[in-house]
UniProtKB/Swiss-Prot annotation:
This is DNA/RNA-binding protein Alba. It holds the Pfam family Alba. The modification N6-acetyllysine is found at K11. It comes from the Archaea. Acetylated. Acetylation at Lys-11 decreases DNA-binding affinity. Its main location: cytoplasm. The keyword Phosphoprotein does not apply. It is found in: Cytoplasm; Chromosome. GO terms for cellular component: chromosome; cytoplasm. GO terms for molecular function: double-stranded DNA binding; RNA binding.
Length: 90
């Protein structure tokens, strides 16, 4: 899958990500978008997928949802961070 079909969710406003997904579906004639998030951004990723499906692209479907836990090495030692990967198809 091309790297431009992946949306990494962070601290930007929710609608920025929704707009990016809608733009990719409409302009790039892609049929598959992956939304990725870790930690506190997981709930925002779910909101983004739901807003996209219900308000903008009603024919979008969930193809796959992956949940995972990643071990990250930080200043305070190793910590586990949850991650999600939501695949939307059209």
């Amino acid at each position: 899958m091309a790297e431009e079909n992946v949306i990494f969710v962070g601290k930007k406003p929710t609608m920025n990500y929704v707009l990016a997904i809608v733009t990719q579906f409409n302009n790039n004639s892609t049929s598959r978008i992956v939304i990725k998030a870790r930690g506190k951004a997981i709930s925002k990723a779910v909101d983004i997928a739901e807003i996209t499906r219900h308000k903008f692209i009603q024919d979008a479907k969930y193809d796959e949802i992956k949940l995972d836990t990643e071990s990250l090495q930080g200043e305070k030692g190793e910590s586990n961070v949850s991650s999600i990967e939501i695949v939307l198809t059209r």
